[in-house]
Amino acid sequence: MDLKYLILMIAFATVEINVTESRQNDKRRWKNDKIYSHYVNICDIQDRGSKVHCYCESIKIKTATKADCWVFNGGIAEDDPFWSNFYSQPKIEKLTFNVRADGGLTYIPAKVIVRLERLQYLNIQYANIYSIPSFAFTNSTTLREITLPKNKIAKLEKMSFAHLIMLSNVSLVENQISELKRDVFYVLPNLQRLYLSKNIISVLHDGCFKHLNNLIKLDLDNNQLTVVIRENFQGLSNLITLDMRNNKLTMIGDLAFAELWSLQELYLDGNEIEFISERGFGGLTQLRKLSLADNKLGTLDDGVLDDIQKLNVLDLRNNNLETLKQEAVQNVLENMKSNYALISLDGNKLTCDCRLSWLHKLRNETKSKRVKASLSRLNCIMDSKTNVGTLKIEKPQKAIQGSYKKEMDYEEEEFEEKHYDDAMQDQETDNDDTKIEYKRKLLEIPTEMLPCPNRLIYEASFSPPTQDEVKYYKTSSSHMLVATTVNLLLSVLAIL
């Protein structure tokens, strides 16, 4: 009997506890609802005169996860009470501000960021934010992506982006940033992508990226950079892709990218590069793609690619190259035979001569369809008025004289009249009307018919003598000296 009574008492006690907890939860919920009821639901603003209107996937209070907000009517002050209304939708994860009026938003709305404890994606565009102050994003522990295009941002203060431990992407494209100072990006352990395209950046301070150890992609294209040095890229040991297209670089100095140990893709298209130092790409042992299209390169010197042992994509389109010697690409030539390789030389004024004969062999040996297609359409220029012969380089026994020149001229004339008339394209005449250039498909000219420049033949003519030739020269000189001495003595005796 006592046991039954005890069990009954426990059951009543349990029910009482549950009822009490339920009342407390209801009271707590009522209290929260009362708190949120003080704020206007930003997803259901009825006031047409409101400075901000937001459109959400749900207008029910405390349920929206996405909000697309528009700033109207001359803008809104940083301390405007309206910002507190974001408490009505505390679950927002993705927030966008579109500014319709010039000057409508001149700051980063930190009071919104701090209220949204689940915010992951922040996008602001068409504002008039001159400067981003220190800690502008309130040390958020949830922000993953910050996108700020077309906001007229000109200045980034020290630690503008700081202590954002989850941040992985930052985009500042199409602003007016002119320089990057040190410590702008600070304690961002997960930042992987930084987009700074279409600004007016002309100065990278030494170490401006030194805290971005995990960055894998950096876009600096369409800026006004005129020079880059090794110190600009300190800390970017894990960077994989660097885009510096359409800047104003004129040369690449020694070890300019040596801090980028993991770099695999380097884009330098659309600059004004005329010279690359022999160690310009030193240290880029992992580089696989190098794009130098639309520059002003007149030559690619031997040794420039020696450190890039894994390179299999080389884009040299639209430069001023007159030739590309095999020695310049010897270190990566085998890579160009792989399935995914590419070498592109279109848009240069390559001369049709024996210095390009190695491209025939590459065309036959490569497995890459892209390489074959690129080389098949490659044009070169045959100049009918220059002293170019069609002979192979040989060591002539005698110096080149006028008779040899006539022979060269004859063979050149025969070549032009009897071969490849159907391949002739785009005849070009110089201003002096004395020189005609013919564009031809390089691979349609057999290697044995590719002419060699006179200077190459000249250099071959005066190659260093062999040991036998040196020995013979010394012996002949000695005999001549003895004979001269004897003749001189006989002449003296005859006089006496």
Functional labels for PLM-detected ranges:
Residues 2-496:
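Extracellular leucine-rich repeat
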